[in-house]
Design a protein with these regions (language model features):
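Short, low-complexity, polar/charged sequence segments that are solvent-exposed and flexible
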Residues: 10-12, 35-38, 57-60, 115-118, ...
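Metallo-beta-lactamase
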Residues: 14-16, 50-186
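A generic local structural motif
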Residues: 1-4, 23-28, 46-49, 82-85, ...
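Pre-active-site segment of Zn-dependent metallo-hydrolases
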Residues: 1-37
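Generic recognition of short, well-ordered alpha-helical segments
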Residues: 3, 51, 149-152
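Active-site metal-binding motif and surrounding structural segment of the metallo-beta-lactamase
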Residues: 22-68, 136
Length: 187
């Protein structure tokens, strides 16, 4: 599955979000300004966060409830025993960063959608994200979506999430009764 890191450059410095320890990416991120911290948005996204934070001499903030002194608002996505996730909203830049609940890789979107809800969350998508109209939607798996498409893609993914489960469930009986195709060459 595609893993994506983000560097959010503010006037004070750079925040690394769920970074992967790839030297070229870390160098590029730190070239944007003084590193201020590493933010881990999903409890399972341990990745290389601790090692990067230690190497850069900055704090590691794991699924923070708030980020005082930063331009970011923290949005709770899910708080359960096995899934703790928050998202970041940067109002000045109209940037929404979501670690896992939304993605653009080939596993999450349905049909021609740019963005999809994580399959486990499709019945209970993070609807509180509907109130946001991002100019930039950054995800933990896949490429970001920018411009007007970001808000449209976000709202479509959230709006179609439950319907996608219904479509899948409705197709199960047909797939169960469908005869398997023969392998090439008979047999």
């Amino acid at each position: 599955m595609t893993r994506t890191s983000h560097a959010l450059a503010t006037s004070e410095g750079v925040w690394l979000v769920d970074p992967v320890d790839w030297p070229a990416a870390i160098d590029r991120a730190t070239s944007l300004g003084t590193p201020l911290g590493v933010i881990q948005l999903l409890d399972r996204h341990n990745r290389d966060n601790a090692a990067i934070a230690e190497r850069l001499g900055v704090p590691l903030l794991v699924v923070p409830e708030s980020l005082p002194g930063t331009p970011f608002d923290v949005i709770e996505i899910k708080r359960a025993k096995r899934w703790r996730e928050v998202a970041l909203w940067w109002p000045e830049q109209r940037t929404l960063v979501v670690a896992e609940a939304l993605a653009t890789n080939r596993f999450f979107p349905i049909g021609d959608d740019l963005v999809g809800v994580h399959p486990v969350l499709r019945l209970t998508p993070p609807r509180r994200l509907r109130t946001y109209e991002p100019e930039h939607l950054l995800v933990g798996h896949g490429e970001g979506v920018h411009g007007r498409d970001a808000t449209v893609a976000l709202h479509e993914a959230l709006g179609r999430s439950r319907l996608s489960v219904v479509r899948w469930a409705a197709s199960v009986p047909f797939r169960m009764w469908r005869k398997p195709t023969r392998p090439p060459g008979g047999g």
